[in-house]
Swiss-Prot record:
Keywords: Cytoplasm, Methyltransferase, Nucleotide biosynthesis, Transferase. Pfam families: Thymidylat_synt (PF00303). Pathway: Pyrimidine metabolism; dTTP biosynthesis. It is an enzyme of class 2 (transferase). The gene is thyA. Catalyzes the reductive methylation of 2'-deoxyuridine-5'-monophosphate (dUMP) to 2'-deoxythymidine-5'-monophosphate (dTMP) while utilizing 5,10-methylenetetrahydrofolate (mTHF) as the methyl donor and reductant in the reaction, yielding dihydrofolate (DHF) as a by-product. This enzymatic reaction provides an intracellular de novo source of dTMP, an essential precursor for DNA biosynthesis. SUPFAM superfamilies: Thymidylate synthase/dCMP hydroxymethylase (SSF55831). This is Thymidylate synthase.
Length: 264
């Protein structure tokens, strides 16, 4: 994952210090892009060990349309704990916007189901887009969406995905986001009868928190290892039928985990 280390190095060398919502402070650049060929391996960071279980369960949780952390807690995933209320609710976050976007006439739009239908009927469409950024409901969300919008693209029988991430916590968040959307692309490709193409990550405010600099510098001393591969259960033909057991990460080698505090 040289691309990821290049981003981290770029921010260390060119980042501007900015204050932020959490009061921690960041070193930030605006606008950056990384490209990953999904045929060359599954883009899971190898310069520190990543928790794939959390990535998979979070994605399945999004696809369920859920906005309560009960499913995550049931499966030992704590990444949303800091933002949930006493009942485990997060407000109308990702899952709600993906699966139940409220329309002015009272309908709810299932963006994911619509996307899958459009992919099969008109794969050349330039409208293969899902947005989590709903300005009318931002204030009701425990945390506004950082990965705000993604678009699929089909060419030569291959499915590619581009994500726009408005706010990118490079050390803690971005490795999760890359792996999550790469996995989503593999899942959608299988169900749509396509081959995986590229995952393209586009970041807006790309930042390292001031209390992550030591960890980032340690990671930059490490040499990337060969990428693993991700196997999906070929029997799954519907996107919403995937379960945790349908994924197998093969050949993942990684340097030791690096701990860092979460800015809330």
């Amino acid at each position: 994952m040289k691309q990821y280390l290049d981003l981290m190095r770029h921010v260390r060398e060119h980042g501007t210090f900015k204050s932020d919502r959490t009061g921690t402070g960041t070193y930030s650049v605006f606008g950056y892009q990384m490209r990953f060929d999904l045929a060359a391996g599954f883009p899971l960071v190898t310069t520190k060990k990543c928790h794939l279980k959390s990535i998979v369960h979070e994605l399945l949780w999004f696809l369920q349309g859920s906005t309560n952390i009960a499913y995550l807690k049931e499966h030992g995933v704590s990444i949303w704990d800091e933002w949930a209320d006493e009942n485990g609710d997060l407000g109308p976050v990702y899952g709600y916007q993906w699966r139940s976007w409220p329309a002015p006439d009272g309908r709810h739009i299932d963006q994911i189901a619509n996307l899958m239908t459009m992919l099969k009927k008109n794969p050349d469409s330039r409208r293969l887009i899902v947005s989590a950024w709903n300005p009318a409901l931002i204030d009701e969300m425990a945390l506004p969406p950082c990965h705000a919008l993604f678009q699929f693209y089909v060419a030569d029988g291959k499915l590619s995905c581009q994500l726009y991430q408005r706010s990118a916590d490079i050390f803690l968040g971005v490795p999760f986001n890359i792996a999550s959307y790469a996995l989503l692309t593999l899942m959608v490709a299988q169900v749509a009868g396509l081959r995986p193409g590229e995952f393209i990550w586009t970041g807006g405010d790309c930042h390292l928190y001031a209390n992550h600099l030591e960890q980032a510098d340690l990671q930059l001393t490490r040499e990337p290892l060969p990428l693993p591969s991700m196997k999906l259960n070929p029997e799954v033909k519907d996107l919403f039928d995937f379960r945790f057991e349908d994924f197998e990460l093969v050949g993942y080698q990684a340097h030791p985990h690096i701990k860092a505090p979460v800015a809330v």
